[in-house]
UniProtKB/Swiss-Prot annotation:
UniProt lineage: Bacteria, Pseudomonadati, Pseudomonadota, Gammaproteobacteria, Aeromonadales
Assembly mode: F-type ATPases have 2 components, CF(1) - the catalytic core - and CF(0) - the membrane proton channel. CF(1) has five subunits: alpha(3), beta(3), gamma(1), delta(1), epsilon(1). CF(0) has three main subunits: a, b and c.
Subcellular location: Cell inner membrane
PANTHER family for this protein: ATP SYNTHASE GAMMA CHAIN, ATP SYNTHASE SUBUNIT GAMMA, MITOCHONDRIAL
Protein name, per record: ATP synthase gamma chain
Protein family membership: Belongs to the ATPase gamma chain family.
Protein function: Produces ATP from ADP in the presence of a proton gradient across the membrane. The gamma chain is believed to be important in regulating ATPase activity and the flow of protons through the CF(0) complex.
Pfam families in UniProt: ATP-synt
Organism: Aeromonas salmonicida (strain A449)
Keyword entries, A-Z: ATP synthesis, Cell inner membrane, Cell membrane, CF(1), Hydrogen ion transport, Ion transport, Membrane, Transport
Topology in the lipid bilayer: Peripheral membrane protein
InterPro entries attached to this UniProt entry: ATP_synth_F1_ATPase_gsu (IPR035968), ATP_synth_F1_gsu (IPR000131), ATP_synth_F1_gsu_CS (IPR023632)
GO molecular function, one term: ATP binding
Single GO cellular component term: plasma membrane
Length: 288
């Protein structure tokens, strides 16, 4: 059994760690609330943009934008949104598993895969696995803007325009609540058929375009992709802070349990030490 002094040092070390994880839990909780506010503010725009684009896709257009047209899939692109830092439980690894499962399905069909990565964790993971990375951005901080993402988005859109990729997906963690973050692999291009799109087709909704459909769609569809990627980033940020808060709370609780266990061991060691001292005193007295 370890000595009482050694155990006391361990208890002090665990208490210091507990203070750190407790502080990180409070910081994560504060950041999560701010991230939720940004996420909630941008969600209506992203969802409305998706609906409008879905209605447009089902309209009777003379001009068919390339982003609305299906084509043979030979190469698939993924924009993967991860965190820059760890200490957030299995958030990143669960996301990467979902992405890899989807990539394997396309690889089984003979399609190649290109990646644009957001966040250091995605970069280190996929580069370690030998993936073909076309773009990478990191260090977005706690308040990312669309301008921070445009570079990576443009790389993938240019590849799509040039026929270098035939389908584009967004991979991110969707924030459901504090305890649940859902890995998502959403198709961006060509525009997927959704329930809203089916409803639009059923009711034959249409739009009048000014000045002309081509000019409007060329701009609107790019904004659509940018808005979906930005929404994915802020959803992932809220998910990160929620996962970190839960992970640090668990670490703090575990530290408390460990301190209690060590305290019992310390008490036993102290008791054994006192018993030995008394035994030695009694033995010495008996010898006299």
């Amino acid at each position: 059994m370890a000595g009482a002094k050694e155990i006391r040092n361990k208890i002090g070390s665990v208490k210091n760690t507990q203070k750190i994880t407790g502080a990180m839990e409070m910081v994560a909780a504060s950041k999560m609330r701010r991230a939720q506010e940004r996420m909630s503010a941008s969600r209506p725009y992203a969802e409305t943009m998706r609906k409008v684009i879905g209605h447009i896709a089902q309209g009777n257009l003379e001009y068919k934008h390339p982003y609305l047209m299906e084509r043979e899939v030979k190469r698939v692109g993924y924009i993967v949104v991860s965190t820059d830092r760890g200490l957030c439980g299995g958030l990143n690894i669960n996301l990467f598993k979902a992405a890899l499962n989807d990539m394997k399905q396309w690889s089984a069909k003979g399609a190649k895969v290109d990646l644009a990565l957001i966040g250091n964790k995605a970069s280190s993971f996929f580069e370690r696995h030998g993936a073909k990375v076309q773009a990478h951005v990191a260090g977005l901080g706690d308040n990312p803007s669309v301008n921070d993402l445009i570079g990576s988005v443009k790389v993938m859109l240019k590849a799509y325009d040039n026929g270098e990729i035939d389908r584009l997906y967004l991979v991110y963690n969707k924030f459901v609540n504090t305890m649940v973050q859902q890995p998502r692999v959403d198709q961006l291009l060509p525009l997927p058929v959704t329930e809203d799109s089916k409803l639009a087709k059923k009711h034959h909704w249409d739009y009048i375009y000014e000045p002309d459909p081509k000019q409007l769609l060329d701009t609107l569809l790019i904004r659509y992709v940018e808005s979906q990627v930005y929404q994915g980033v802020v959803e992932n940020l809220a998910s990160e802070q929620a996962a970190r808060m839960v992970a640090m709370q668990a670490a703090t609780d575990n530290a408390g349990n460990l301190i209690n266990d060590l305290q019992l061991v310390y008490n036993k060691a102290r008791q054994a030490s006192i018993t030995q001292e008394l035994t030695e005193i009694v033995s010495g007295a008996a010898a006299v």
